[in-house]
């Protein structure tokens, strides 16, 4: 006894539906053109990159910022402490705050001037190192100048 299916047509499977849209637009073509150097062309400049400040210049700038921030922080802290200290006279804290602000602006200007002075020495030293491939012996003069500037700045 043979088995029969009952129909002569094969069973068709349903195709899965496509979930993304089909596009007939082609991707843009970017022709890669390579320039052939001619006999008169100049080679590309190797030093055309922008230079970042050196490590010592960044340290000097950071030190100047720390000094200014410290001065302002101490002044504000002293002012807030003076407000809550409970002194009987109101005019004395106001005068003291004005005097502290005057001292702070003077210190800030001095700190900025010293920071700028040492920043110049730091730039000179790092420039020398860059030009001489990091040779400290050649740049010792600039290193001594930077150390002297930093020592002078510590006294203030």
Swiss-Prot record:
Segments of skewed composition (Polar residues): 84-110
Transit peptide residue numbers: 1-21
Predominant place of localization: mitochondrion
Feature: compositional bias, Low complexity: 1-21
Alphabetical UniProt keywords: Disulfide bond, Mitochondrion, Transit peptide
Compartments where located: Mitochondrion intermembrane space
Residue ranges constituting the CHCH domain according to the UniProt record: 115-156
Disulfide bonds: 118-149, 128-139
Placement of sequence motif Cx9C motif: 118-128
Segments for region (Disordered): 1-50, 78-110
Matches recorded under InterPro entries: CHCHD2/10-like
GO biological process: aerobic respiration; mitochondrion organization
Superkingdom classification of source: Eukaryota
GO cellular component annotations of the record: cytoplasm; mitochondrial intermembrane space; mitochondrion; nucleus
UniProt-listed PANTHER family: COILED-COIL-HELIX-COILED-COIL-HELIX DOMAIN CONTAINING 2, ISOFORM A-RELATED (PTHR13523:SF2), COILED-COIL-HELIX-COILED-COIL-HELIX DOMAIN CONTAINING 2/NUR77 (PTHR13523)
Other known facts: Present with 6960 molecules/cell in log phase SD medium.
Protein name (database record): Mitochondrial intermembrane space cysteine motif-containing protein MIX17
């Amino acid at each position: 006894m043979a088995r029969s299916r009952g129909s002569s047509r094969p069973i068709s499977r349903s195709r899965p539906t496509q979930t993304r849209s089909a596009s007939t637009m082609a991707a843009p073509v970017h022709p890669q053109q390579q320039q052939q150097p001619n006999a008169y062309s100049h080679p590309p400049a190797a030093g055309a990159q922008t230079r970042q400040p050196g490590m010592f210049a960044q340290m000097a700038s950071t030190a100047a910022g720390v000094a200014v921030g410290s001065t302002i922080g101490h002044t504000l802290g002293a002012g807030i402490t003076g407000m809550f200290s409970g002194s009987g006279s109101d005019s004395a804290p106001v005068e003291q705050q004005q005097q502290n602000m005057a001292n702070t602006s003077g210190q800030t200007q001095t700190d900025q001037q010293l920071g700028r002075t040492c920043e110049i020495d730091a730039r000179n030293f790092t420039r020398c190192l860059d030009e001489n491939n990091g040779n400290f012996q050649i740049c010792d003069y600039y290193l001594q100048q930077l150390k002297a500037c930093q020592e002078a700045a510590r006294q203030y």
